[in-house]
Amino acid sequence: MSTVKIISEEMCVACFDENVKLYIYDCGHKCCCKECFERVERCPMCRHLPVENIKPSTHVPAIPSAPSFELINMEVETREIHPRSSRAKSIAKRMVYGMGPSFLDKLFDCKSGRDSMAWGKMCCICTKKTNDEMIKSKICESYYCRDCRDYLFQENGADQPLPFCPCCFKKYNGFEHVSAH
């Protein structure tokens, strides 16, 4: 017989100290003592990242500039969200660039220079650029590297690939939506 330990409402779920004052995260979970609340970056229950726990980062990844238009000035917008936060700036840039060319085409109504953009042949799953042959989706025009395609589309065996595109979540039948590019 296995024993089940019932966690009381005054028990910290991170260090298991009992009869302590618990702090509430932005997500609404009341689960950590003061020491764990200051130490643990995300909510232990749902992994939600509270806004006040976003720490400034000194590293901002190099993002290629778009050839035919200029993106929104991220510095002005991030100062309003969180002062001195280059991490918020980095997240905002990655969100815009991570959407890929189809998102930017819809946002800016621009199709010129699409193939010359730096992210044109980046895998939408692992976000790395490879010199290998990329596979292009016919549904959402996103690219997959060989490793991600083999892992995602043949995970359950060649007879049962994923029933949806992992980038746009549209349903499809088999491998007919991907083509070598």
Curated annotation (Swiss-Prot):
GO terms for molecular function: zinc ion binding. A zinc finger (RING-type) spans 12-47, 123-169. SUPFAM superfamilies: RING/U-box. The keyword Transport does not apply. InterPro entries: Znf_RING, Znf_RING/FYVE/PHD. Keywords: Metal-binding, Repeat, Zinc, Zinc-finger. The keyword Endoplasmic reticulum does not apply. It comes from the Viruses. This is Putative RING finger protein ORF97. It comes from Ostreid herpesvirus 1 (isolate France).
